[in-house]
Amino acid sequence: MTVERAKLYFMCGKMAAGKSTHARDLARTKNAVIFVQDEILSALYPGEIRDIDDFVKYSARVRVALSHHIKELLSRGVSVVLDFPGNTRAQRQWFRGLFEGAGVEHELQYIDARNDLCKRQLRQRSEVLPAGSPWTTDAEFDVITAYFEAPTEDERFNVIRHERA
């Protein structure tokens, strides 16, 4: 029997590309602990995240609070899946600090999906959200997607690309 070493799995992909679904599936198949940013933010800051600036401020706090704990899990042999966006080069540096700090392997799970698919999935998931929920419209998708940067070879990540049609 082969024992797999701890590994950090993290996500990259446009809004509504299917990152959260993939992260949950990955955590289950790899028997890994999963941290879901949206759930953590909702629990810690209910009703306080109304725009991009709020999201950036509060998500930075969560990353600071969790970094030590995630590295500790990894260094003790527990694989971790982070359902946090790694959608810009700057965001991906946090993940690098985690896996390098713990001395473990990593996989950047890149969910590559076209804008029209993401918008269709965004509309479907938004149907069940309360009115006024943030990040539910095509216009908001366009604003957020303008910041998206696909991973590049020079970043030196172990990229696993999942193309969604």
Where are these regions (language model features)?
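Conserved substrate/cofactor phosphate-moiety recognition/catalytic segment
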Residues: 17, 21-78, 124
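ATP-dependent NMP and nucleoside kinases share a basic, alpha-helical "lid"
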Residues: 43, 48-49, 74, 86-127
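Amphipathic alpha-helical transducer elements in NTP-driven molecular machines
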Residues: 56-63, 67, 112, 138-145
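Hydrophobic anchor at the beta1->P-loop junction of P-loop NTPases
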Residues: 11
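Conserved GTP-binding G-domain of TRAFAC-class P-loop NTPases and closely related GTPase folds
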Residues: 2-8, 25, 29, 33, ...
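P-loop (Walker A) phosphate-binding loop of NTP-binding proteins
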Residues: 14
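Flexible, glycine- and charge-enriched loops at secondary-structure boundaries
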Residues: 52-60, 85-88, 134, 138
